[in-house]
Structure formats: structure tokens, C-alpha cells
Amino acid sequence: MINLSINKKVIIFGFIFTFFSSFGQSFFLGLFNAPIRNELGITHGQFGNIYATATIFSSLLLIWVGKKIDEYQIIYYASFVIVLLFLSSLFFSFINNIYLLSVGIFLMRFSGQGLMSHTSTTTVSRFFEKSRGKALSTIWFGLSSAEFILPILITYLFVIYSWRT
């Protein structure tokens, strides 16, 4: 018999993690492109090169850190990922040169797009045997929701606050 209460919790966990993976997704970080370029005085090409390099390095590190999910209980691994995303977001708000921008984008891509989505997908895939496809499609609605909500919210907040806030 399937415990629906636990199933719901796992789906909610996956949904939340895929939603917050958006902090490292291109659609989200792209919202900060113009204010960062203007403040740092860099071109589209320079920003693109930094972004591409940071993405490649974050994907390489994900190969090593991602497999650690098999060595730790999910509560500890997920807590690590949450703290890392929080610290990455905090670090991102202090960017004031291209070197910090490189590290900031790397951290956001690694913790958000990389580890948050990896953690949600791996956890849900492990838990669901029969309805794995349904469960995964449900949790990935979290990213679709973020793609709808966050650009509107961030654009509105840019009117009131600096991009660093």
C-alpha cells in the first residue's frame, strides 16, 4: 500500500526544490544582466564569456558533488544545498568586480540550477517506482511556476529596489 501522506511530502519537496533551482537558471540570472553590466562597465560579450565559463565549471563540479547524494541521508544533503544556495545568493549581492561576478555566477549556477534540480530529481526518482514519470512531471511544474512568477516579481522589485537587494 502506498502512503499518500509521504508521497505528497516528497512531491512538495521536489516542487519546492525545482522552484528554487530557478535562482541558478538562465531565465532568472538574465534578469540581472543589464544592471550588472551597467554597474561593472562590461559588454554583453564579456558577461556571456563569464557566464559560459562559470556554467562549465559548475557542471564539472556537479559531477563530483552530485554523486555525494548517494553517501548521505537526503535531509543532510538537502540542508547543505539550501545553505549553499542561500550563501550563494548573499555572495551575489556583494559583486563589485568581474572576478566576484565570475565566482557569483558559478555559485548560483552550481547551487541553484545544478544541485537544487539534481536533489529534487534524484530524491523523487528514488522514492517513486511505479509512477515515477508522473511524479517527475509534477515536481518540474515548480520550475514552470518559477518561470512565470519570478520575472514578473523581479521586474516589479527592480522598480523599488536595487538589483543587489
What function would you assign to each model-found segment?
Residues 27, 55-63, 147-148:
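Residue-level signature of mid-helix packing/kink "hotspots" within the transmembrane helices
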Residues 61-73:
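Helix-to-loop junctions at the C-terminal end of transmembrane segments
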